[in-house]
Amino acid sequence: MGLFGPPDVEKAKATGRIEDMLRAATYKKDPAVAEAGRAALTERLDLLINELGTRNIRRLQISRESLVVVGPPARDRLVFILGEGHVHRRQDAAYMLGEMKDEAAVAPLCDSLRHADPLLRMLSAQALGKIGSPGALRPLRLACMDRDPKVAAEARKALRKIPGGVPGTAG
């Protein structure tokens, strides 16, 4: 990668540096470079998913950002994790699905509002608020009555972000 030029996707692929691929995928001056960067990240989707289990905060953040940039292929994997994974992986999946703001994640996120883990319920409510889909109104209204006050508060915040959402009412 040159100091002032566009990111070198081929070099990033050859070295396996995810961070350089991410830099290329988010390069705004040349759509072809950005697309090549996204394609390189998509090829490493399994690695990115596995990195969600790391304790290295920097690698975790790079993996999260990369998965969001990859888009629909990563979304499908994250939706699966949201329904089947370990609770910490589910929490990560809920967070990233919210960052993606993809309507296809609304139903699985609504389902996770009923999970036993309060942090997962809270992150799912936040994600639904970021997506802003009217399809989440009823589940979020029910979540406003959650036994955990933090979950209920996040559900109310999410409802305020969705057109037609009236906080504090059950529908």
Where are the model-predicted features located?
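Structural detector for internal amphipathic alpha-helices that build alpha-solenoid repeat scaffolds
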Residues: 1-15, 20-53, 57-72, 77-83, ...
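Short, flexible active-site recognition loops that position polar ligands and cofactors
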Residues: 145
